[in-house]
């Protein structure tokens, strides 16, 4: 009986030991379909959101930093720290190391001071420009990212010849290299804009005092002298880059500036003169035609009389 009891006690112990056959026959746990579907929908939505975040490379860098933080928060909520794509981890690691304005990054957004500088330059407010330059002198080299105009372009456009001299002297004192003939949108230099707006003193300051290059051409191949008004003096044309043969032949007087009131009046007078000449020519032609018609009728009558009356003599 003791042996039977011992055998009975050993039998359950042996049955509890796992065997290869029992492992194969045991049911394996299956992943929940609901979990798989939710994860699939999550990754699909995350990929769609990532594709919509940056439709083109010029998107501001603030959205990139915010998207990285949002992705990290989503993974923390869903417990997917280990299942994040490698691309997301690399982007967030780069943001942590360098940030949107770190070394080697292409920061495209404007700082508040840069934004204020561009607005003040476009409006020609020198007092605001001077305060900003005292705080950050490097703003002098900052141009408008849309038009490509520097502060010299805007001052020349507004006719601020004294402010041009002050800005140039400030650049010399601070050791900043300021290009007086730098091209902007369309290849226009500050000298081109001064000629377009009819600011004679600005032209004299740019060429005579600041050493602007009067031979620079815009993208249409025109120098600043081609945008002067028709009644501009010859000395001003010479400063604006007109050559001797242009001044002698009079071709330098050709004005391409549509904003000039003198050009508009000259074109209107030319149009009126051309209309008057055309009207006179038509009247003279009609009179000549009438005379020819009358002469032909008289000749026909004379020939008729000669046939009817042979004794009729042409007198």
Swiss-Prot record:
InterPro entries: Ankyrin_rpt, Ankyrin_rpt-contain_sf
SUPFAM superfamilies for this protein: Ankyrin repeat (SSF48403)
Protein name: Ankyrin repeat domain-containing protein SOWAHD
Organism: Homo sapiens (Human)
Disordered: region residues: 1-39
Entry superkingdom: Eukaryota
Entry's family note: Belongs to the SOWAH family.
Intervals holding ANK repeats: 112-141, 147-162, 186-216
Cysteine pairs bridged by disulfides in the record: none
Keyword terms: ANK repeat, Repeat
Lineage: Eukaryota, Metazoa, Chordata, Craniata, Vertebrata
PROSITE patterns noted in UniProt: ANK_REP_REGION, ANK_REPEAT
């Amino acid at each position: 009986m003791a042996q039977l009891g011992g055998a009975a006690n050993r039998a359950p112990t042996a049955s509890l030991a796992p065997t290869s056959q029992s492992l194969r026959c045991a049911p394996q746990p299956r992943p929940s379909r609901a979990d798989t579907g939710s994860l699939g929908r999550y990754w699909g939505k995350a990929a769609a959101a990532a594709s919509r975040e940056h439709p083109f490379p010029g998107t501001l860098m603030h959205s990139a930093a915010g998207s990285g933080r949002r992705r990290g928060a989503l993974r923390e909520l869903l417990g997917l720290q280990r299942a994040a794509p490698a691309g997301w981890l690399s982007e967030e690691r780069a943001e942590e190391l360098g940030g949107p304005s770190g070394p080697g990054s292409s920061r495209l957004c404007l700082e508040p001071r840069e934004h204020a500088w561009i607005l003040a330059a476009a409006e020609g407010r020198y007092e605001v420009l001077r305060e900003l330059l005292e705080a950050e002198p490097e703003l002098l080299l900052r141009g408008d990212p849309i038009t490509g105009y520097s502060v010299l372009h805007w001052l020349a456009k507004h006719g601020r010849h004294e402010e041009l001299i002050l800005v140039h002297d400030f650049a010399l004192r601070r050791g900043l290299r300021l290009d007086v003939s730098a091209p902007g949108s369309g290849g226009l230099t500050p000298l081109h804009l001064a000629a377009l707006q009819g600011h004679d003193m600005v032209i004299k300051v740019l060429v005579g005092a600041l050493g602007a290059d009067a031979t620079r051409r815009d993208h249409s191949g025109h120098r600043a002298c081609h945008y002067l008004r028709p009644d501009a003096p010859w000395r001003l044309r010479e400063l604006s880059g007109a050559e001797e043969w242009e001044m002698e032949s009079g071709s330098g007087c050709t004005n391409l500036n549509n904003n000039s009131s003198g050009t508009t009046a000259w074109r209107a007078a030319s149009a009126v003169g051309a209309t008057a000449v055309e009207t006179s020519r038509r009247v003279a032609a009609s009179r000549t035609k009438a005379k020819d018609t009358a002469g032909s009728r008289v000749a026909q009558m004379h020939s008729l009389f000669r046939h009817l009356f042979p004794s009729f003599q042409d007198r």
